[in-house]
UniProtKB/Swiss-Prot annotation:
Family: Belongs to the CCS1 family.
Localization: Cytoplasm
Protein's name in the database: Superoxide dismutase 1 copper chaperone
GO molecular function: metal ion binding; superoxide dismutase copper chaperone activity
Binding site for Cu cation 1: C15, C18
CDD domains per the UniProt record, alphabetical: HMA
Cofactor note: Binds 2 copper ions per subunit.
GO biological process terms, semicolon-separated: copper ion transport; removal of superoxide radicals
Cofactors that this protein relies on: Cu(2+)
Domain HMA: 4-67
A matching Pfam family: HMA
Signal peptide residue numbers: none
Function field: Copper chaperone for superoxide dismutase 1 (SOD1). Binds copper ions and delivers them specifically to SOD1.
Organism of this sequence: Debaryomyces hansenii (strain ATCC 36239 / CBS 767 / BCRC 21394 / JCM 1990 / NBRC 0083 / IGC 2968)
Length: 250
């Protein structure tokens, strides 16, 4: 059984009706032990064992967007954006996201979502190196194998809500698929930072078309209350709009 952890989301809300809608969406999820909705700060906090991607999807079903602002205790979370290095995907390379949260000593959960891939079983693994100079081929030996991921849900508007990447509009309907898995690893967050995650169609092997990305530390719950980026001067929602244009959906 997955241990409980805290997640903080930024959600644009204007009135009590917005709060009620978000509250109803959270009540429908099994595994959330408690939640708090702060209208003034536009923040939603949950505690439980539900994958972050599923909570994002539930909130977005109300018509509101949701951005994860922090997960777990300080220094207990990481993130990895999975990209394709295949030339045919150059216009939209982002295909997946792994959110990693420590729920105990040597106990991690990995919320892995992918979108816009051929149907089939894929094999994610953590690699020893974070060198992406040759895509997945330069990430080194396997550091830790994760469980297989079934990619079998046809791409649709609902899959792009809580995933990264999107099917090209020129692709025939039904030819690309999405998948989501809640995986476990007997590791610590400190073991992972700077390494990489790959997603391969081949078990125990890396292929040129394998997705890959570097694992980076991410904010714990309440460690990121930024509303405006000090570098760009843009709000989180302006940055969100730019990310959406590049295929980033959550």
């Amino acid at each position: 059984m997955t241990k409980s952890f805290e997640i903080v989301f930024a959600v644009p809300m204007e009135c009590q009706s917005c709060v009620d809608s978000v509250s109803s969406s959270l009540k429908s999820l099994n595994g959330i032990s408690k939640y708090d909705i702060d209208l003034k700060s536009n923040l939603v906090t949950t505690e439980g064992s539900v994958p972050p991607s599923e909570i994002v999807k539930a909130i977005q079903s109300t018509g509101k967007d949701a951005i994860i602002r922090g997960t777990g205790a300080p220094n207990s979370a990481a993130v990895c954006i999975l990209e394709s290095f295949d030339p045919k995907d150059i216009q939209q390379p982002v295909k997946g996201l792994a959110r990693i949260v420590s729920v105990g000593a040597n106990d991690l959960v990995v919320d892995l979502t992918v979108n816009g891939l051929p149907q089939g079983v894929y094999y994610p693994s953590i690699r020893k190196s974070g060198n992406l100079s040759k895509g997945a081929l330069s990430t080194g030996e396997c550091f830790y194998p994760l469980g297989p991921l079934e990619v079998d849900q046809p791409v649709s508007e609902s899959t792009t809500i809580n995933s990264l990447g999107a099917a090209s509009p020129t692709v025939e309907e039904g030819s690309l698929y999405a998948g989501q898995g809640f995986l476990h690893a007997d590791l610590n967050i400190s073991d992972l930072i700077g390494r990489s995650v790959i997603l391969s169609k081949l078990k125990d092997k890396t292929a040129p078309d394998s997705l890959c990305g570097v694992i980076a530390r991410s904010a714990g719950a309440w460690e990121n209350d930024k509303q405006v980026c000090s570098c760009s001067g843009k709000t989180v929602w302006q940055e969100r709009s730019e990310a959406l244009a590049k295929g980033l959906k959550s």
